[in-house]
Amino acid sequence: MSTKFEKLEKLARESFQSPEVPETLPLIHLRNGMIIFPQTVVPVHVAREKTLLALEQSIESYQQFVFVTSQKDPSVEEPSFDQLYEIGTVSKVLQVVQLPDGSFRVLLEGLERARAYEVVQDNPFLVKLEILKVNYRKTKKLEALIRSVRESFAKYAYYTQRYSQETLSAMSEISDANRLADFVASLLPLQLKQRQSLLEQLKPAKRLEMILEILSHENEILEIERELDTKVKKRIEENQKEFFLREKLKAITEELGEKDTEADQLKARLQKLKLPEHAKQKATLEIERLEKMSPYSAEATVIRTYLDWLFNLPWDNSTEDRQDISQAEKILQASHYGLKEAKERILEFLAVRKRSNSVKAPILCFVGPPGVGKTSLARAVSQALNRKFAHMSLGGLRDEAEIKGHRRTYVGAMPGRILQLIRTAQSKNPVLLLDEIDKMAVSFQGDPAAALLEVLDPEQNKEFVDHYLEIPFDLSNVLFITTANVTHTIPPALLDRMEIIELEGYTDYEKSIIARQYIIPKLMGENALNEATFKITQGAIKKIIHTYTREAGVRQLTRMLQRLMRKSALKIEQGAKSVVIKSKDLEHFLGPQPVQNDIMLSKPEIGAVHGLAWTEYGGVVMVVESLLMPGKGDLILTGRLGEVMRESARIALSVARSFCGQDCKEKFQQSDIHINLPEGAVPKDGPSAGITMTVAMISSVLGKPVRNDTAMTGEITLRGKILAVGGVKEKILAAHRHGIKRILLPKTNEKDLKRIPPQVKDKMEFIFVEDIEKAVEKSCS
């Protein structure tokens, strides 16, 4: 074989005068994106057996002529003719050199374009060719293209610094458009498809346009890269001085023996902390970033703040829950009167937790009017459980970043309030109070209620991710307690995640006990009074409850008692030995009675009925007035009524007309009925006044007075049926505060009497009605 190739090499070195290109030539197919253009000399590496046979045949039988084309897919080892480009270049073998690895380097000179249209032989390929002649006329446009290509290539060569001055000189001497296009195309680092397109383009002008477009695109990118390099170089030069000084300072520090850098101190601190693995990895990454940057840069300050938060969160700190359930019960009883359901739920949690540490903390929601002890009960729960306590008010909150924090890309970014409270408590299992959860707002900054879904979901909060921290923090051990006045303003998805515990309003009896056992001892301590210097009679306490306060809770009662003690302390400082507060002294100490029963009916009246309503502040008693006057049968409604109450009034009118029958037909047709609910500045809505408005209308039409010791509540249907309503306990307590003795309730609300305290229930008469007939019978005297 070596003798054969020595002969091949010898033949290639011999001078050769080509007559004409033969019609049939051996075919050499190149890969790896190589294409030979006419009038160019290209070295080619040859190793495949089939290619070597074609080369040998070219030298021996075809005067060193060979047809060179490219593979469409370079990965194919032995392509078929269909996998080759038809158009290629007729080339001449100038030199063959054998390499140490047994392959050959062949020097080929491209002569002219040709198209292979028929295969004569397969191994090696022998093909018939059609020579593709290039004919063109010189025009001004062609001359302009030649100049543009020269200038663009010179600019490209300047940017890339790839080409020698000899190459540029050779290009400038080429005046033939066809040759210039092929010369420049052979020098550019193009993709295979781009090279093949240029080879197949027979019009020099079109080929120059394609090359000019490629050069313009490359020059634009190179110019941008050059600008960026200039900016980077300038920035590096500006930072060189600072870098040099920093390195010098570092060397001086090492010489002085001060080897503990900031990064070393942080790493040592990290080793002492009991962080979970993912938190350690994050901290290590941030310390490494800090180590590589200037200690005076803004980014370094951001990283220090982040690491400070990461290190100071209580990843492993927790308090041990109280195991003595009886002791926990004593703490709850000592702090609050009543509230049986809430206390039982906390003790149940303690009992289960004592038996199994894997139990998840409940998500509790205390719902009730203001002043009933929702917030203070949450504090008592933390004491009973022996846990840390943290508090956050959600009222008016409208930015979800307050819950989940800001991302560190923002200036002044901080974690959300949840993690801030956890850090303040320094415990991963505190009692966390989210106050006023029913008063959150929605804005363009997001929905905080949606952000709370992850916080209050026991299935998700084990891996709560704050936007600032960017790594999970376990909230599953936190006992979340939320408070609300009403539930209808809480989003359903959020409400579904919480266990609702209703804290209803107190009776006057309960308020007097709370005042005597809880409020007065606490306030006496705050005002430095004792039993020898300050006394208040039971009658005075009851009078304050009846005439100076009218509320579901005890907040206003506390203010009144606080005011009494301040004035008593002043009298003692002015010389009095002690102060005893009696009922008759209240007006002197507290001023005129602010609570009057002006709205209450003093005697039975026609068209005036006591109604019961329920608001977020507790139950209220209101008077529904009905007036019959000459008109055309219209219904007039005043008192700032909502749409539901207006519809209920229209139903009440229809029921009243049906109840009164044909005898009153003309009266309804020739009269207008005016329904009014006093206190017109207060908005009112809901269906529970249906029975009240119906009875008031019937009373005014029939001329029957309604008993003034009676109040009622219930929704009316078009068939005159009375449906159940909510807030029954609050409504009954409100009626009791106003001295009402008889209550008309829907029959289906009879079960709610079980929740009424005996001291209230025993003093009132409850009448359960199913339809309007019985309601009129029991209320009209």
From Swiss-Prot:
ATP binds at G368, P369, P370, G371, V372, G373, K374, T375. Residues 603-781 form the Lon proteolytic domain. It catalyses: Hydrolysis of proteins in presence of ATP. The active site is at S688, K731. Keywords: ATP-binding, Cytoplasm, Hydrolase, Nucleotide-binding, Protease, Serine protease, Stress response. GO terms for cellular component: cytoplasm. It is an enzyme of class 3 (hydrolase). InterPro entries: AAA+_ATPase (IPR003593), ATPase_AAA_core (IPR003959), Lon_bac (IPR027543), Lon_bac/euk-typ (IPR004815), Lon_lid (IPR054594), Lon_proteolytic (IPR008269), Lon_Prtase (IPR027065), Lon_prtase_N (IPR003111). One of its GO terms (molecular function) is ATP binding. Residues 25-219 form the Lon N-terminal domain. It is found in: Cytoplasm. GO terms for biological process: cellular response to heat; protein quality control for misfolded or incompletely synthesized proteins. Gene3D superfamilies: 1.10.8.60, 1.20.5.5270, 1.20.58.1480, 3.30.230.10, LON domain-like, P-loop containing nucleotide triphosphate hydrolases. Its main location: cytoplasm. Induction: By heat shock. It comes from the Bacteria. Belongs to the peptidase S16 family. ATP-dependent serine protease that mediates the selective degradation of mutant and abnormal proteins as well as certain short-lived regulatory proteins. Required for cellular homeostasis and for survival from DNA damage and developmental changes induced by stress. Degrades polypeptides processively to yield small peptide fragments that are 5 to 10 amino acids long. Binds to DNA in a double-stranded, site-specific manner. This is Lon protease. It comes from Pseudothermotoga lettingae (strain ATCC BAA-301 / DSM 14385 / NBRC 107922 / TMO) (Thermotoga lettingae).
